[in-house]
Amino acid sequence: MALSFVDFISQAMAQPSLFVILILVIGVTAVSGATDAPNAIATVVSTRCLKPSVAIGLAAVFNFVGLVGMTYISTAVAKTMFGMVDFSGNTDAALYALMAAMIGAILWGIFCWFFGIPCSKSHSLIAGVTGGAIALNGLAGVVPAEWAKVIYGMAFSLVAGFFLGWLFVKVIEKACTHVNRQAANHAFTGIQDVCAVALSFLHGAQDGQKFMSIAMLGVALSFGNPTPDSNGFPMWLMIICSLAISLGTIVGGKRIIKSVGMDMVKLEKYQGVAANFSTTFTLLFASLTGMPVSTGHCNTSAIMGVGASKSFKRVNWGIARNMVLAWVLTFPACGLIGFLLAHLFMMFA
């Protein structure tokens, strides 16, 4: 949909709820930057390759680049987001239901950020949108074939992240058996810096498409079309969302870095490289195949796999358990909030 910013403002004047949806998209995107984007740089900080302030600045820049850049490479994730729910029906009711879904995701994200829980904004968004769609159209509001990609993504990121983290550690240890430790650590520092850039790029690519998809869904609904054009996004929307995710990263980064990179398992530099390789591969594959996944989910699984490669006792399973609990709670919590708020809002449609 070729939509200029002037066209958007004109449409929002006719449908004020559309402007509210854009504000909510910006809010959710910023919360994602605060709670999920720091996962991309957790290992590079925990292994002391970069200072937290430098790493957070790097993440902010390349989240911006990734969000804009991936739009020109692949929009597979956006197509999944567009296709997994059905908001067809009364235009005003659909827009109100979409607003409720966004508010549910924001409330849950703020709760998790306040308590230092690295929850997934991806899962929050998907759950909230699903709850809103069900409130609007019942179970017919969910498209099982597309929604299944969410389940595939969760399973893939957990299994692939853990296994590849374990595997890459073994490969690196074998390859560096006779390498001078000081020289190896110097090389691993540089590699981790590159990985931090790649992971920040991929986080922006994954989450950017999810959030921009909701904004474009709102635009499409305001025109009476339940299915947006997934071939691209207007530049003004990409710039707004990329700035939001970068600002969120700068504001909220340190709290999540501590939970993921420092408290769960103590990493050496080569182990940080292994975790980053694992997360990079997992995110890239998911982005190209249209599976919406969480950077935090992928990174946490990779770190646990790396820690388990030495000994299962090296992993702080209490931290890991709390994270898994947060993931498990996100779908029913955000889904229910989105569902209830949608019913409440639609009373005024």
Spans of model-derived segments:
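Multi-pass alpha-helical transmembrane bundle typical of ion/small-solute transporters
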Residues: 2-349
